[in-house]
Amino acid sequence: MADGKAGEEKPEKSQRAGAAGGPEEEAEKPVKTKTVSSSNGGESSSRSAEKRSAEEEAVDLPTKPTKISKFGFAIGSQTTKKASAISIKLGSSKPKETVPTLAPKTLSVAAAFNEDEDSEPEEMPPEAKMRMKNIGRDTPTSAGPNSFNKGKHGFSDNQKLWERNIKSHLGNVHDQDN
């Protein structure tokens, strides 16, 4: 039984050290593993049942909810302090900024829509003028969705165009034979 008491004291000392060390150390300490051998089914021959039950009880004493609550309270207190500091700073700066920003915005909007200053008409660049002309297949507009059947000569039916070419060639060949 003296060995059992010594085994019980060691986990308690490690628990006290973990509590003094902080929440990070507490999370690492309570994990305990047993050596497993295949010959005796996971039980160590040198350890008695009393020693194992005493150590398991000592490990079960610290509960996880207490650790989580300590950690949760630490985070909660930090966030409330930061939120109050931020709200005070924004509250004091809001009235000063709103008054000056309204006056220049109204002046800039009025100046933007003032038509008296723009007496000369806007000039179009030559590239834009060229794009607006619809000259054959090579214009950018021929690639649009409404330009499906467009060729070099504008909108035309390719089948009809092929028939016309055949007729003209037949007419040329017939004229050459005569």
From Swiss-Prot:
The modification Phosphothreonine is found at residue 139. It is found in: Nucleus. This is PEST proteolytic signal-containing nuclear protein. InterPro entries: PCNP (IPR029169). May be involved in cell cycle regulation. Pfam families: PCNP. The keyword Nucleotide-binding does not apply. One of its GO terms (cellular component) is nuclear body. Its main location: nucleus. Interacts with UHRF2/NIRF. The gene is PCNP. The modification N6-acetyllysine is found at residues 64, 150, 152. It comes from Pongo abelii. Residues 1-15, 160-178 have a biased composition (Basic and acidic residues). The modification Phosphoserine is found at residues 53, 77, 87, 119, 147. GO terms for biological process: proteasome-mediated ubiquitin-dependent protein catabolic process; protein ubiquitination. Ubiquitinated; mediated by UHRF2 and leading to its subsequent proteasomal degradation. Keywords: Acetylation, Cell cycle, Nucleus, Phosphoprotein, Ubl conjugation. Residues 37-47 have a biased composition (Low complexity). Residues 1-84, 134-178 are annotated as: Disordered. The modification N-acetylalanine is found at residue 2. Residues 139-149 have a biased composition (Polar residues).
